[in-house]
Every structure is written in structure tokens, then in C-alpha cells.
């Protein structure tokens, strides 16, 4: 209102009257809400849990090691913000097949699953832009829980909609990397210190992603 008046325009044409502004400021009239959308939409902390399990052992003839790790991290968005999951698997086997022949096998893989909200505009920053564009003069909820308030003038409906993957759309991305290697080593007994080694390796990375937007 003040910017409107200072720009030389009449006070009568301002979007809000002084009385309306005071009602929004007081926060005592349900018809004049003042919603803190950042506080309503965003968590103060991001829940996550991680679990690791390892196993190792063996004999003089064979040694082994195995590792499994799991991470689950929720989004900063309180409602329908999605989550990130990661699986780590690693194993190693060293074996002495014969007196002068040994083998080594290594394997590792990382699997990542990302499940987040999405809408077809402005890419990764759309949710953050929507938070700042969602106006505080709209309520975060309505008396009828089956209805959703429209809280934005930029055509998105508000960040409480676009930040919720159950209401706006989904962006699901799955990544997997695989590394595997194996080797054989043969010690030539006739020539001390001489050995021959064969080595094979695999390095693979893949990504699968799906986008879906509700009409």
C-alpha cells in the first residue's frame, strides 16, 4: 500500500485498505490470514537413518569381505516432498587355488532412488520460486479437508500444491553403478620372483528417470 501511494497513485486504488492491513497484521480474524508458508512447508530438520553391515573372515586359503549399507533421507518439504534412498554393496574374495595360483574377485554397486515433486516449469528451482510467490494472505487449509486453497496469482495454485508430489507431479530417478574385477596370478616356480597375471574388469553406470504431471 505504501509503495502504491508513494508512486503517486491514489490511496483508494491500492490493493488493500489500511483497515485490511491491520487485520492481516493482528492475525485474529480468520478471514484475514497471514500464513508463513516457509514455516508451513519446510521442516526445521531433515529426518534420515542409515544402517551398515559388514562381514569378514577366512582362512589361509581364502579370505572374504562383505559390506551392505542403506541410507534413507526425507525431503525438507513436510508434505509429499519425497525422499532419497541409497544402497551400497561391496564384496571381495581372495583365494589361493593352488600353491602357485591365486585369485581375487572384487564387486561393488551403488543404487540410488530419488522420489521428488515436479512440475514442468523452471526445472529444479520451481518449488523454491513457488514458495516465495505464494502469498501469505491465503490460508494453508480450509474447513473442508477435501478442498485445497488456491494461494498464488502466478497460475500454480501455490507452493503447498507444487511442492507435494501427490498433488503436482513426480520426478523419479534411479541410478546404478556397478564395478567388478577379477584377476588370476600365477607364480613361475622355475624362476623365483617371476609371475604372470590376467585381469578383467567391468564398469557400468545406468540411469532411469520418469516424469509425471497431474492435469
Language-model features: where?
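Outer-membrane beta-barrel domain signature
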Residues: 68-70, 75-76, 81-82, 89-90, ...
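Tryptophan-centered motif/residue detector
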Residues: 36-38, 87, 212
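Outer-membrane beta-barrel transmembrane strands
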Residues: 43-62, 69, 157-212
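Residues embedded in well-ordered regular secondary structure
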Residues: 1-80
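Short N-terminal secondary-structure initiator segments
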Residues: 1-21, 88-111, 151-181
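Extracellular loop and loop/strand-boundary signature of outer-membrane beta-barrel proteins
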Residues: 38-40, 74-79, 90-92, 165-170, ...
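Membrane-spanning beta-strand positions in outer-membrane beta-barrel proteins
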Residues: 52, 63-67, 96, 100-106, ...
